[in-house]
Amino acid sequence: MKVNSINTLAKASVCAALLTLVACADQTAKSTGAKELAAIWPKLDIAVKTDPKVEQRITNIMQDMSLEQKVAQVIQPEIRDITVEDMRRYGFGSYLNGGGSFPQGNKHATPGDWIALAESMYQASVDNSMDGSTIPTMWGTDAVHGHNNVIGATLFPHNIALGATHNPELIKQIARVTAKEVLATGIDWIFAPTVATVRDDRWGRTYEGYSEDPEIVGQYAAAIVEGLQGTPEDNFLGEGRVIATVKHFLGDGGTVGGDDQGDNINDEQSLFDIHAQGYVGGLTAGAQTVMASFNSWHGDKLHGNKYLLTSVLKDRMGFDGLVVGDWNGHGQVAGCSNESCPQSINAGLDIFMVPTGAWKPLMENTINQVKSGVIPQSRLDDAVSRILRVKIRAGLLDNPSPENRALAGKKDIIGAPEHRAIARQAVRESLVLLKNAKQLLPLDPSLNVLVAGGGADNIGQQSGGWTITWQGTGNENQDFPGATSIYAGIEKVVTAAGGTATLSPSGTYQAKPDVAIVIFGEQPYAEGNGDIANLEYQRGKKTDLALLRSLQNKGIAVVSVFLSGRPLWVNPELNASDAFIAAWLPGTEGGGIADVIFSQQDGEIKHDFTGKLSFSWPKSPNQTNVNRYDKDYMPLFPYGFGLQYGETSTLGNDLSEDSDNGKQQALMALALFDRSVQAPWKMALSEQGNTVPINASVVSAKSLQFRTIDRRVQEDAFQLQWQQSTSGQWRIYNDFPEDLRAFSEADGVLTFDYLLNNTPAAAVWLQMSCMDECPSDLDISEHLKVDATQDWQSLTVALSCFTDKGADLSQVISPISIRTSGNLNLTLSDISIRPDTANGNLITCD
């Protein structure tokens, strides 16, 4: 079934097909009082009805629960921060694994390893020997484009691509597959779907949204919830089903400037019309959980917004499931910390998501706050009753333990061929053809084809963020058994037809090809880290454009396959391409691209382009929030655009290439670690000749350990722990040299923030390395200071310190490394090379 685009989107309320289930909002409501609440926010006809037997069971369970047992139900720690014995002692109501968190910290954990951890936690939770409780816990995970934390899983195109398919039935199939693969690892609950209506494409989570059109978001939300959970008429939360979460409530796609965790200043009518339609769809379909958002609404953090969480969501819309927080999001509420936040639970939060060691003081403080009356007993009881309601509906109080469930440990489910076939279909249907000069496509598969670009044979790049690791970084093709890179898909089709497919990321060749297919685009990122200042692609250093132009100048026809998590300003790249495809982030089944761009051997079309833009495409870098039905709507490609074979492409090679950025082209800071290591840089530990890539949140190399921590937001810093190592080293590096001479000419500096927990026991060496041997060690021991208040400090080193010692900045392969041979506990954040700022604790080496 295909979705027909709506003809109009009234500024007031979307009263389309989806909203026939509810009363459409009063168009004239302006304020937020009680009457206006009733007018703006609908009472939903939710598919899952109240069951008196379930309610009586909740009452029976709760009458025997102690205060401590009740509070344990509202605490959700992370697997890196608790042990099985902690679960046995406290009986947490739920727990999670964050992105990049695995059983035993092993990125390559098998389905059996996941099942073993699930079983251990389950058995500990029902063991009443220490906490007196037998209520089973439940495990939540971010399975946002398939079971994306697990090696070998089927990874689907990200939501922005699925929006281009305009096919909610396909979305439902994807949800069913995801549920099965998640259940095969013993997990009960997934934190999906994201139902943000994205209005500013600078937001780093744009690719998690299906569309800028709220109607599409609402329809998709209903489809994916039904696929994950089933329906009351079709095996609701039965075998093969998981608990769904609609997130993030509310308005995360509409913050000022596209700022992640920023402020949404829409009026209340727009908040409903634009940003609430995913909840209308998802909750009506019976979603059992809602995740509160990091963002604010008019300055008030959603984790503490009682009006929206309780008055709107629970009381008016009729949601009777549970509201879970996001990663220590409660700590951002005014007057709160990660360790204490009665404001959040009083506002309507039912579960604190509390990674890090903050879970223990939070639990203790919450118990004391209930005892003192700061948190009313009735509010705690309501939260616990909601948690139990979800568990009972999901069968968790009656089902066998994780290792004894129907799909548990079935390895053949993970990445099953029939699952990959659905993912490949999704890739085909999501591709949007933006340009096809002289009907270059489809290509004859018997040609001599050059396959170029950094994304050609890079499954990690084509899969994007939230892929094995949180940011999607640190992955290699071998981390994706059973997957197909875009090049591999092309090579298979071309070889079968008697043609030749040559992989050359740099675009070099021996025999001139008939055509070049260049796969390029954004490097993986996730929330926060993906926020950008404007929509210009490869702002500053346009290496991909240089590749396209070099091929075009040699008379080679160029097909561009653009990998991105959002529409970007690519006018120069469009001009340098004969055909241009928006491929989004297709996931593990790269063969879907070859399915469409090549004809059959007899010249007949095998699969046509059917994808249509669900996001408007900008005509300038600063057209950051161009959306359908906007006043003066003038994108480069409008919502719904997408060519098919045989249609005339009117786009020439004369698009304006004026970036309109003016002085913004000046030398900018080079971020090395900004909430995560920045592509193309990578991190590694080494000791005694043993090098260990940092591709997970906890990594060890003999006596040197790396662990991500939270400074301001999730995993935006990391701790290095040396234990009398034999010169253990941490470094940021690249496989290819980078020319950093422009920074030296600008009196540049290397700078980072740090926390030091102990005085260095031995010399601490800071080094910058280049392609050829270039010794540049600096002993920074005396500059690292232990701060008694544990405040962050900055250390800034002039680049001249390195060049004076012989560093060649024209060929830098490691811009920073730190090594020592003594005990040291050092935490780092915000690492960059920048023009001289004359700030911080500057080391000049004069």
How should each PLM-predicted stretch be described?
Residues 24-692, 846:
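Glycoside hydrolase catalytic-domain context in secreted enzymes
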Residues 93, 447, 748-750, 814, ...:
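Residue-level detector of short, conserved catalytic/binding motifs and their immediate flanks
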Residues 2-26:
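Gram-negative bacterial Sec-dependent N-terminal signal peptides
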Residues 700-731:
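Short carbohydrate-recognition loop motifs
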Residues 725-807, 821-827, 832-839:
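Extracellular ligand-binding interfaces
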Residues 387, 450, 597, 750-754, ...:
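Buried hydrophobic-core signal for structured, non-transmembrane domains
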Residues 808-815:
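Short, surface-exposed ligand- or partner-binding patches at beta-edge/loop junctions that are enriched
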